[in-house]
Amino acid sequence: MLQICPTVHTQTVGTHMKKELLIILFLTINLCFAQTSTEQIELSDSALELTKQDVIYDPSYFSIDYPNGDVPSGKGVCTDVVIRAYRKIGIDLQKEVHIDMKSDFSSYPKIWGLKTTDKNIDHRRVPNLMTFFKRKGAEKNISQSGEDYLPGDIVCWNLGGAITHIGIVVDKKSKDGKRNLIVHNIGGGQVLEDCLFDYRIIGHYRYGI
């Protein structure tokens, strides 16, 4: 009996330790998911907040401050929605894109014939943002399933030809409940619409959240 008891005690302690480790692991995983979810909702809320502002679609070239530069508050294009939403959660895409582009200019598109970076406009071009997000490992799967596009995700579309577009997935559902809505500016200002699958998706990203 004296030989059996220590064995039982050791097994009991080992079992308790395993349970405690599993509980700690479970709580840690849940905490990580909760943190990610919170950051996604923060970006989603930032995008929704932008829909309260009156903005005229204006693709003009503007000379802006750096860092944290922005075009006039009453103007903007699709990329400005993304830039402004990220800036509200402390991420300056103007600065981040410029730094990355400066470090490896040859990896970015040469669509506009530029030979060097331009802090006023580089971050305001969809192909540049797509390249930046991909280089940062933020690329996600492109699918035709609405549940794959979570609040805070960035989606890029091809509207036809060489015309590209970008918007933010937000925490609002379509009327049929099958997909999240999009905050974007396709010409009518910073608006909330059910348009996820209205155009051909060419990019899906989850960056900084």
Describe each PLM feature range.
Residues 36, 64-73, 115-119, 140-144, ...:
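Second-shell loop/turn segments in exported
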Residues 26-34:
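Hydrophobic h-region of N-terminal signal peptides that target proteins for export
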Residues 34-76:
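Active-site-adjacent structural segments surrounding the nucleophilic cysteine of cysteine proteases
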Residues 59-79, 92-116:
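Acidic helix-start/capping segments at beta-turn-to-alpha-helix junctions
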Residues 18-24:
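Sec-dependent signal peptide recognition
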Residues 48, 52, 83-91, 98, ...:
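Sec-exported extracytoplasmic/periplasmic mature domains
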Residues 39-44, 102-183:
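...with weaker cross-activation on analogous glycine-rich loops/strands in unrelated enzymes
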Residues 179-209:
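Low-complexity, Gly/Ser/Thr/Pro-rich intrinsically disordered linker/tail segments
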